[in-house]
Amino acid sequence: MASLGVILFFVIASLIHGKPIHSERKAAKIPLEGSNLGYKKPNNIYGSRLSQGMRYPPSMMQLYQTLILGNDTDLSILEYPVLQESDAVLSLIAKSCVVVGNRWTLSFDMSSISSSNELKLAELRIRLPSFERSQDVTVEIYHTKEGQENLFMGSFKTNPSVAMGSSWKIFNLTRMLQYYLHQGEPFTNVEYIEVKNMHERAKPHVIKRGVRAEVEEGLQRNKDNTPASSFPTERVVLVVFTRDKPTASHFGSPSLIHTVESSKYVMSENTVRVTDTRRPRRNQKTKNTIVMNTIPSRSVGKTLCRRVDMIVDFEKIEWGDRIVYPKRFNAYRCEGACPIPLNETFKPTNHAYIKSLVKLYDQEKVECSSCVPVKMSPLSMLLYEDGEVVLKHHEDMIVDECGCN
């Protein structure tokens, strides 16, 4: 992984341009309209083909690079613990940005924010012009979906010019989104959210200013007929950190399954997830070792269980349009025969060792143990999901050690 990280660093570094743009989630009572409440298989077995030229925020590439290289110092005070708890990061570019006087109306398609996940952190990141004058503004947040009415999520007050320095400003919207996911209604508490510069990235705090009796109506409500203006949507990004809720499935986290179901290749029903089994330490370890060593292992006439290379090239398995990075990686695999009886070299469970002894004295009674992964590590992937770029952390993707079980 270390060498892979170094290689990816130079590949990624050459593609990053401009300044980077830089969530506990519970089940929603009333989800967002059009939200992803569960994976639905597309009619086309390939899913929706994604354009090779689809844009993705440079910040997502930078975050992926930081994760691969393990450079925790590049993370903010708030991002560091959140990343440890999250397995997906979603970056949503605004659909529209309308400014009417001191009122900003920002719209995002939040369909990708699934109520089946835990919301860990939500940050609104805005790049303001350097000449922006200092004034208090009211920011309204809407969920918008093509062909549907805009849904008001909530609003807050702030003065974006207070934090001098970086043109990128950060606002913590975690509470607003969590409130909607919990209550199924707009966040009507008008609060003052302190702005932070991108380079500070310290944890912003919220100062309550009071409760508004009525929710503002309309995307472009303008009582004083102040001329409306707008600024580029790519300067407004909503970054959401999430975590999949545990399921009862023996396959473990469903995130990877959701990703691959739209591929040409579908996971077999016979696929079995091998978990990391650990043999408990006990005082009889010396005795067990003596027993194992005094019974000679039979020659199986084959190469013994070991780890070998297995290069996964996403282009060759037709995932190239979906995976941004890495385009290929070494997942490794286990192959070879298991000796009879087993010894500590092959990291057997107690059951596997006993079974190998039974096999030694009664060939027909049990089958041979299999060479399988006994220790695995995760892989972070930058990929397209529902038209958005997502950073996902998939467990059990790379074989670290093989053994007989």
Swiss-Prot record:
Expression sites by tissue: First localized to the vegetal region of the blastula. Just prior to gastrulation (stage 10), this expression disappears and instead becomes localized to the dorsal marginal zone, with enrichment in the organizer.
For this protein, the record's PROSITE patterns field holds:
TGF_BETA_1, TGF_BETA_2
- The source's superkingdom equals Eukaryota
**UniProt subcellular location:** Secreted
- What S-S linkages are listed for this chain? 305-371, 334-402, 338-404
An example Gene Ontology molecular-function term: cytokine activity
Q: Which residues form the propeptide?
A: 19-282
Q: Which Pfam families match?
A: TGF_beta, TGFb_propeptide
User: In UniProt terms, what is the effect of altering residue 334 to S?
Assistant: Fails to induce mesoderm
Q: Does the keyword Aminoacyl-tRNA synthetase apply?
A: no
Induction per the UniProt record: By dorsal mesoderm-inducing signals including activin and other nodal-related proteins.
Q: Which SMART domains match?
A: TGFB
Q: Where do glycans attach?
A: 71, 172, 343
- Where is the major localization of this protein? secreted
Which UniProt keyword terms apply here?
A: Cleavage on pair of basic residues, Developmental protein, Disulfide bond, Glycoprotein, Growth factor, Secreted, Signal
Q: GO CC annotations? A: extracellular space
Q: Which GO BP annotation is one of this protein's? A: gastrulation with mouth forming second
Note the InterPro entries from the entry. Answer: Cystine-knot_cytokine, TGF-b_C, TGF-b_propeptide, TGF-beta-rel, TGFb_CS
Q: Name the protein family.
A: Belongs to the TGF-beta family.
Q: How does it assemble?
A: Homodimer; disulfide-linked. Forms heterodimers with the TGF-beta family member derriere. Interacts with tsku; enhances nodal2 activity.
Domain comment from the record reads as follows: The pro-region is necessary but not sufficient for wnt-inhibitory activity. The central region is required for muscle induction activity.
**Protein purpose:** Cooperation and regulatory loops of multiple nodals are essential for mesendoderm patterning in early embryos. Essential for mesoderm formation and axial patterning during embryonic development. Activates the activin-like signaling pathway to induce dorsal and ventral mesoderm in animal cap ectoderm. In addition, also dorsalizes ventral marginal zone (VMZ) tissues during gastrulation. Induces muscle actin. Appears to act as both a short-range and long-range morphogen. The unprocessed protein inhibits bmp- and wnt-signaling.
Q: What is this protein called?
A: Nodal homolog 2-A
Whose protein is this, by species?
Xenopus laevis (African clawed frog)
Protein's gene: nodal2-a
